[in-house]
Amino acid sequence: MANIKSQIKRIRTNERRRLRNQSVKSSLRTAIRGFREAVDAGDKDKASELLHATSRKLDKAASKGVIHPNQAANKKSALALALNKL
């Protein structure tokens, strides 16, 4: 355990951020999985709705610093490509 007051605070904030990042990444994986299942089922309408929702989640995660903006862009591009192949 740290002795310095600022480091004790940093440990607390790091833990809060770690939990937030973990939660956001988990919800991203769930959203992407749902989209891929809709694409595999061939349901274009549902996949289109899920693409919009998933893209929004990716953008929000990138703006909050949970994932890198380029990673969000790459994932959105791959998902859009999968939808367009239907």
Swiss-Prot record:
Residues 1-22 are annotated as: Disordered. InterPro entries: Ribosomal_bS20, Ribosomal_bS20_sf. This is Small ribosomal subunit protein bS20. The keyword Signal does not apply. Residues 7-20 have a biased composition (Basic residues). One of its GO terms (biological process) is translation. Binds directly to 16S ribosomal RNA. Keywords: Ribonucleoprotein, Ribosomal protein, RNA-binding, rRNA-binding. NCBIfam families: S20 (TIGR00029). The keyword Ligase does not apply. One of its GO terms (cellular component) is small ribosomal subunit. It comes from Mycolicibacterium smegmatis (strain ATCC 700084 / mc(2)155) (Mycobacterium smegmatis). GO terms for molecular function: small ribosomal subunit rRNA binding; structural constituent of ribosome. SUPFAM superfamilies: Ribosomal protein S20 (SSF46992). Belongs to the bacterial ribosomal protein bS20 family.
